[in-house]
Swiss-Prot record:
It comes from the Bacteria. The keyword Ligase does not apply. This is Protein HflC. Keywords: Membrane, Transmembrane, Transmembrane helix. The gene is hflC. The chain crosses the membrane at residues 3-23. Pfam families: Band_7 (PF01145). HflC and HflK may interact to form a multimeric complex. It is a single-pass membrane protein. InterPro entries: Band_7, Band_7/SPFH_dom_sf, HflC.
């Protein structure tokens, strides 16, 4: 009897534990009955909010789905602009589930990886289409906000305006039970080969500017040097002129003094002049002079010889 009671209690406990389930905060639960999504009388999917809930044991199973916002980083990819120029765009998407039944069916059982594969594919197509309508300047400046807004709207609504329609556009993320919350572009870069070409062109332009600046500097230096040389030549010329004037004035003063003293002491004047003449004449021992011995030139030498012989 005790064994039967224990067995019955165990079965009852198993049934009761299988009859209740808890949905955690940040999750939503959907019940599958024989593998199919459980719907209410209005044929809408029954979604269980956080809390304790009942289900039929063994007949129904519960699938928990993450109701929080997901962030999906996209690998940097190459896109072509309206000008047929390549850009490397790095971006990310924030999304959440807005239709748990459709999401469960579209992703093969609520697989997040499968959902993001489908989302990346649609996002890449929409971003490629939007970038193809813009030029580089519009993308990297004031059009970035409009670009991401257009991509966001096209992902949520598709290519058709269904605001007044109850149908789900198969081109929108609603077909996957997903709502895209935000789209952001992290970086926009040029391809490596384009960046290298631009860098080389900029370097060539800078080198050309540097050569031009150096050439202009050398030209200015030559002009300054020529101007300085000209000023120096003028200063030297003025100095020589002034020196010659001073020298002439000095010689004139000397001549004037000699003339004045000559009148007073003519013999002394002739004596000094003769000494200077002797000095200039006999500087070089190789000089040969043919002069009459009775010439006045040798008068003082003769006097010195006569004085010596006395």
């Amino acid at each position: 009897m005790n064994k039967i009671l224990i067995f019955a209690s165990s079965v009852l406990f198993l049934i009761l534990s299988s009859s209740f389930f808890i949905v955690k905060e940040g999750e939503r639960g959907i019940v599958l009955q024989f593998g199919k999504v459980l719907r209410n009388n209005e044929l809408k999917t029954v979604v269980y909010n956080p809390g304790l809930h009942f289900k039929w044991p063994f007949l129904e199973t519960v699938k928990m789905l993450d109701a929080r916002i997901h962030t999906m980083d996209n690998q940097a990819d190459r896109f072509v602009t309206k000008e047929k120029k390549d850009l490397i765009v790095d971006s990310y998407i924030k999304w959440r589930i807005n239709d748990f039944s459709r999401y469960y069916l579209a992703t093969g059982g609520g697989d997040v990886f499968q959902a993001e594969v489908l989302l990346k594919r649609k996002f890449s197509d929409r971003l490629r289409s939007e970038i193809g309508r813009l030029n580089v300047k519009e993308i990297v400046t004031d059009s970035r906000g409009r670009l991401t807004t257009d991509v966001l709207n096209s992902l949520n609504k598709g290519s058709m305006n269904l605001e007044k329609s109850s149908l789900i556009n198969v081109n929108s993320m609603n077909a996957l039970g997903i709502h895209v919350v935000d789209v952001r572009i992290k970086q926009i870069n040029l391809p490596v080969e384009v960046s290298d070409a631009i860098y080389n062109r900029m370097r060539a332009e800078r080198e050309a500017v540097a050569r031009s600046q150096r050439s202009q500097g050398q030209e200015k230096a030559e002009k300054l040097r020529a101007s300085a040389d000209y000023k120096v030549s003028i200063i030297l010329s003025e100095a020589r002129k002034e020196a010659l004037i001073i020298k002439g004035q000095g010689e004139a003063e000397v001549t004037k003094l000699f003339a004045k003293n000559f009148n007073k002491e003519p013999d002394f004047y002739f004596f000094i002049r003769s000494l200077r003449a002797y000095e200039n004449s006999f500087k070089n021992n190789r000089n040969i002079m043919l002069i009459d011995s009775d010439s006045q030139f040798f008068r003082y030498i003769k006097n010195m010889i006569n004085i010596k012989n006395l």
